[in-house]
Amino acid sequence: LPIWLSRCLESICSQTYQELEIIVLNDGSTDDSLAICEQFRAKDPRLVVVDKENEGVSRTRNAGLALAQGDYIQFADSDDVLDPDYTQNLVQAALQHSADLVIAPYWMVIPSNSSKTGHALETLQESLGIEPEAPKTEVHKYGFLPQGVYSREDYARRLMQQPASFYYGVLWNKLYRREIIAENQLGFAPDVHWAEDLLFNMGYLEHAEVFVSIPDAGYHYIQNPKSICHTQIDLRGIVENKTQVFQLFKEVYTRLGLYEELQPQD
C-alpha cells in the first residue's frame, strides 16, 4: 500500500500534538512499504520501524503493544488519514477527564472505484485506452454517542444500541490507557479473523471506568478494495468467530450485571 501508506504516515507525523511515539510495523510486505517507512524514519526520529515476517494483523498489533511506552495507545490503519488536530483532541479530553477511553466520530470515505461497479468501470476504461474519470468520492460522518463523560455501565448500555457499528467496534477512533492494557494483559487473539477489534474492545470495557465522547471527527476511514479486510476473507472462520462474539457479549454483560436488563425481549 505504498501510496496510501505515505499519505497516512504524513498525516501522523504532522499531528499538532508532538509528544508521540510512532510505532510502524511492516508485516512482511513485499512492495515498497518498508522503504517508505525508512524514509519517514530518516526524517522523523519519533518513528520506530519494525520489519517482521508476515504473521497477520493480530500478532502484529500485539507486537506494537509490547513496544509501546506512552501513557496512551492510539491505532491507525495504513489506508487511512488523520486530521492534524485529531490526536490533540483525544489526548486533551483524556487528560481533562482522567479518561480511560476516549471515543470520537469518524469520516467514512468511499471512492467511486471502491465498489465492484466502479472498479469494473475503471478497468474497462483502462483496457479501452480511455482516461478514467476522476473518482467521485462519498464522505459520511458516523458517531452515535453524544458528547460527555460516561461510566462503564452507561457506555455499555449505549454500545448495545448499536452493537454492530464500526463506531464502537473498531480501534482507530479511540484512545486507550496503556496501563489498563498492560496490567490486564489485553491483546488480540491470533486465531480470530473477524471482529478482532471488537473482541479487544469488549475486553477493555470490563477494566476501564471513565469513558469520554468528543464531538469532533478527525479520522478518515478510506474504503480500499485492495485492503486486507477486503481481500483475505475466511468465511468459515467468520462464522465461527461470530459465535464467539455473541457468547462474549453475553459473558461480559452478565459480569457487568446488565445482561438481564439488555437482553433481547421475545
Language model features with spans:
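A conserved acidic beta->alpha catalytic loop
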Residues: 26-35
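Conserved short acidic donor-positioning loop in nucleotide-sugar-dependent glycosyltransferases
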Residues: 12, 27-28, 55, 78
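Short aromatic/hydrophobic "clamp" motif used to bind/position activated sugar donors
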Residues: 73
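Short, well-formed alpha-helical segments that are part of the catalytic scaffolds
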Residues: 1-14
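Donor-binding/catalytic cores of nucleotide-activated saccharide
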Residues: 81-214, 219-237
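C-terminal, non-catalytic tails of nucleotide-sugar-dependent glycosyltransferases
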Residues: 240-265
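Glycine-rich, basic loop-to-helix element that forms the pyrophosphate-binding segment
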Residues: 52-68
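Cell-envelope/extracellular polymer assembly enzymes that use nucleotide-activated donors
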Residues: 11, 21, 199
